[in-house]
């Protein structure tokens, strides 16, 4: 079993679809192998970027089975199992616990119901007490409509099956969690633009969307940090920041899929209610990524960091 302590650069991987909007496992295998070769050492499968709300129960189970086989222990694998139904979250997490190659579950703060902090504690305590696998909390208030407060995270970090958090919030909140969490509780930022700063503050790393496109650059940034080359690491983060932001200028994961499709990974379009970028949007995205205007309308090279190399 791969563990969180070994991972710093995790990709929240897209779910590729074919022209009939069925999961394309060949494309998933091609993309996964490429990301591992480039320096990714962990994955979230079936998360926000994986369009999990549009996947059926059976599709998720098959996706997780196939993905566990594809990765085959080469990186840590975290599978999304959370929902706004506590009983269903427990049931589904225990199904996923039986799948080879899935190391952890990811349980989101319940969306739509808008639980308060006491309700969140009750929900996650019930999950903790009734599941057969370790899991991470997913705190993403921009999508769930509610924020798990830092004190609540620290309280829940004491529970046996809760091994970490994907935290999409301020750096100040992350600092508090890192300072007060239980030993062995791993903290990951879910904000690409915080990748370097979060690591400096003591987080384990980042769960990233941009790493689909900039794995090599992000790995180089972390390596520079570990080698004490702080100006180089900072330069890479500055280069990445605007590009990371650009990948969210339209509803995600449509932008990252547009880039991957141009690079030949055949991830397909998003399922409704999201739509693919049109040509005008692709031109605008390309401009914000520092590419030629028509770059996403034709074949795109895999290495998009050459101007960083020449900087």
Swiss-Prot record:
The keyword Amino-acid biosynthesis applies. Pathway: Amino-acid biosynthesis; L-lysine biosynthesis via DAP pathway; (S)-tetrahydrodipicolinate from L-aspartate: step 3/4. Pfam families: DHDPS. GO terms for cellular component: cytosol. It is found in: Cytoplasm. Pyruvate binds at residues 49, 207. The keyword DNA-binding does not apply. Its main location: cytoplasm. It catalyses: L-aspartate 4-semialdehyde + pyruvate = (2S,4S)-4-hydroxy-2,3,4,5-tetrahydrodipicolinate + H2O + H(+). One of its GO terms (biological process) is diaminopimelate biosynthetic process. The record marks 48, 112 as: Part of a proton relay during catalysis. It is an enzyme of class 4 (lyase). The active site is at 138 (proton donor/acceptor), 166 (schiff-base intermediate with substrate). GO terms for molecular function: 4-hydroxy-tetrahydrodipicolinate synthase activity. Its EC number is 4.3.3.7. Keywords: Amino-acid biosynthesis, Cytoplasm, Diaminopimelate biosynthesis, Lyase, Lysine biosynthesis, Schiff base. HAMAP family: DapA. Catalyzes the condensation of (S)-aspartate-beta-semialdehyde [(S)-ASA] and pyruvate to 4-hydroxy-tetrahydrodipicolinate (HTPA). Homotetramer; dimer of dimers. Belongs to the DapA family. This is 4-hydroxy-tetrahydrodipicolinate synthase.
């Amino acid at each position: 079993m791969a563990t969180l302590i070994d991972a710093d650069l995790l990709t929240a991987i897209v779910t590729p679809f074919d022209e009939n909007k069925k999961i394309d496992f060949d494309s998933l295998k091609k993309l996964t192998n490429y990301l591992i070769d480039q320096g990714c050492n962990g994955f979230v499968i079936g998360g926000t970027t994986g369009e999990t709300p549009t996947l059926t129960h059976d599709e998720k189970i098959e996706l997780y089975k196939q993905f566990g086989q594809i990765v085959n222990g080469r990186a840590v694998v975290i599978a999304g199992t959370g929902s706004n139904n506590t009983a269903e979250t427990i049931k589904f997490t225990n199904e996923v616990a039986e799948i080879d190659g899935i190391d952890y579950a990811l349980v989101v703060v319940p969306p739509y119901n808008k639980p308060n902090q006491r309700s969140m504690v009750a929900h996650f305590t019930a999950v903790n007490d009734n599941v057969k696998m370790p899991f991470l909390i997913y705190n993403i208030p921009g999508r769930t409509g509610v924020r798990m407060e830092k004190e609540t995270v620290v309280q829940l970090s004491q529970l046996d099956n809760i091994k970490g958090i994907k935290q999409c919030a301020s750096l100040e909140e992350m600092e508090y969690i890192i300072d007060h969490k239980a030993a062995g509780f791993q903290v990951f930022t879910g904000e690409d633009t915080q990748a370097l700063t979060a690591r400096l503050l003591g987080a384990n790393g980042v769960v990233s969307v941009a790493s689909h496109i900039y794995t090599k650059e992000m790995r180089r940034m972390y390596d520079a940090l570990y080698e004490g080359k702080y100006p180089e690491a900072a330069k890479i983060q500055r280069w990445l920041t605007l590009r990371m932001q650009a990948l969210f200028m339209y509803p995600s994961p449509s932008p990252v899929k547009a880039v991957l499709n141009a690079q030949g990974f055949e991830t397909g379009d998003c399922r409704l209610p999201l739509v693919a970028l049109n040509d005008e949007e692709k031109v605008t995205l390309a401009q914000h990524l520092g590419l030629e205007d028509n770059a996403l309308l034709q074949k795109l090279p895999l290495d998009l960091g050459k101007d960083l190399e020449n900087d």
